[in-house]
Amino acid sequence: MLRSMLVVLALLASAPAFAQVQPFPPGFATREIAVNDVTIHVRTGGRGPAVVLLHGYGETGDMWAPLAADLARDHTVIVPDLRGLGLSSKPKGGFDKKTQAGDVLGVMDALKVDTADLVTHDIGNMVGFAVAAQHPERVRRFVLIDAPVPGVGPWEEILKNPLLWHFRFGGPDMERLVAGRERIYLDRFWNEFSADPKRFTEASRQHYAALYALPGAMHSGFSQFAAFDQDAIDNRAMLAARGKLAMPVLALGGEKSFGPMMAAVMRAGASNVTEGVVPESGHWIMEENPAATLKLVRGFLESGR
């Protein structure tokens, strides 16, 4: 652990743009929470009903700073880095989303949070779905943003999209191929999945590229995708055994990305789905149109109070 922290500090010191990403408000604290076989890096702030924000691939919990700053006015905001990503520890396995749901629930338990709203993006959607499907009593409202969930709806058709070739890209040789070229690899995601790549700023690119260059981080990223087949099996089994999610769900798609299809897909896995579209945005909603995203998320959360 000490060696890993020294590596992190060295990277921070050598990357001048690292601090240019919007910071969390001064009232937020960070802590490391030991859960299962990992240590999860968590940011917390605010006071009120709890809301958990889960990031996806190509980013970390840092993506949520603008939303967290607003929600902290009347919520307790909890922002973890997923296992293996950001400043969380880097295990060799456990990247199926049922296991990662256990990480999230463990964080909630450590913070003495019984129930929470979930706001999730990309792979965070998949972890959040596993939380909500296994423990619906702990999720009040659920916002999923711009990524499908394995095994839910037309998953096999979605996999045929040529833009999603990275779902099958991984393994030791692929890790060697990308090692030292993390920025080049990640630029492909930030460019191809943006409505306007310029909105994913150079500061953000340097920030996340440095985090994904940490030892074990790219292995963790590839492992998130490698687990999709098992995730699909698990999700189909949970839906067959327990039925669709019953809590209110907001399915948001970027206008230039999933758009209204996000809600159409999620209706296969949830019975109370509200459709939402983030205008003038591709996949990276917090970089491309944070104001509209914030308005849609806050409006949905407030409708349940």
Annotate each PLM feature.
Residues 4-15:
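Bacterial N-terminal signal peptides
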Residues 20-28, 38-40, 50, 85-119, ...:
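Flexible "cap/lid" subdomain of the alpha/beta-hydrolase fold that forms the substrate-access gate
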Residues 38, 44-87:
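Conserved HGGG/HGGXW glycine-rich cap/lid loop of the alpha/beta-hydrolase fold
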Residues 281-290, 294:
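Catalytic histidine-centered segment of alpha/beta-hydrolase-like enzymes
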